[in-house]
Amino acid sequence: IGDEAQPLIIGERINPTGKKRFKQALIDHDIDYIISQGLEQEKAGAHALDVNVGSPEVDEVELIQEVVGKLQSILPLPLQIDTSNVEAMEKALRMYNGKALINSVNGKEETMEAVFPLVKKYGGVVIGLALDEDGIADTADGRVAVARKIYERAADYGIAKENVIIDGLCMTVSADPESALVTLETIRRIHDELGGNTILGVSNISFGLPARELINSYF
């Protein structure tokens, strides 16, 4: 990851959000189906896999450990531990082989105080969402300010800048056509002004629109 590197594609299909079949697989404890989503994404060219098994109907703390273990036993791809459950995050990081991506922290003090100690302890790379107690800023200025705060607080915990990747937040253009420009300006300034690396949930841009693959690719 860096200025000279090609974009890193993180597969997002191991996630129940908006996926009825996957959510049912979690409820049914259908590990084979969950793993199949990882295999299909590897075949499609993903460089890493997001892993989110959070659902009210399951024990996320136990399930994320099982899924991470199974995926690592079968696939060579790095995994992104995606959870807002701090206990699940720590359990997954404790048994993870290698340096995990951690999704995520944000500019809220409470969240940084909970997540940064785990990043430092287990040596991962954390995704920093450019939002804080005031929500998501409508301007690049606001988002860059949050990114700067995240970097500064990470440094307080002894976490190097290269181990923090900022998500400039990609919003759907169907709700706000100008939001794409704000996102692009945010990531440009994070690179130019803060010297940081960035990540985006690119598919968010097309939510609720037809021809989503075309819109995602163009963006």
Language model segments and positions:
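Domain-level signal for soluble alpha/beta catalytic cores
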Residues: 1-167, 171-219
